[in-house]
Design a protein with these regions (language model features):
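Catalytic phosphate/metal-binding cores of nucleic-acid and nucleotide-processing enzymes, i.e., regions
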Residues: 1-119
Length: 119
């Protein structure tokens, strides 16, 4: 993306720069693989554990992160079409004095399946 010189150098956020490493790490940890073009082509999601899980990875260095209906809809549709459980993993990047770690957002039916063991 080209921008006028008066605006200075275009820089990306820490979270944007961290995304490829986050996706690779999640794929390795979960025994899956990263999807081509980070899910922007025909295969949605960032990480796929075939037949089990479809994962969208997000990261932030801010205090909070908003999960939108559209994010949930896209990963849920992709998971349901392939018979996989949909999930969004949010990584809170290190920030002085702030929580650092990962959380997962899943539809309620996924949580029910995890607790009851039902399919």
């Amino acid at each position: 993306m080209k921008q006028p010189k008066r605006l200075g150098v275009l820089t990306q956020s820490r979270a944007y720069n961290h995304a490829p490493a986050q996706e690779r790490e999640a794929a390795k940890r979960l025994g899956g693989r990263t999807t081509p073009a980070s899910g922007s082509l025909r295969e949605k999601g960032d990480v796929r554990v075939s037949g089990i899980l479809r994962l969208e990875c997000k990261a932030t260095s801010k205090k909070s992160f908003s999960v939108t209906r559209d994010m949930v809809r896209k990963i849920t549709e992709a998971g349901e079409l392939s018979g996989e459980l949909p999930a969004i993993e949010i990584e809170f990047l290190p920030l002085a004095g702030q929580f650092h770690g990962r959380v997962a957002v899943v539809p309620a039916y996924v949580l029910n399946q995890l607790v009851t063991g039902e399919k």
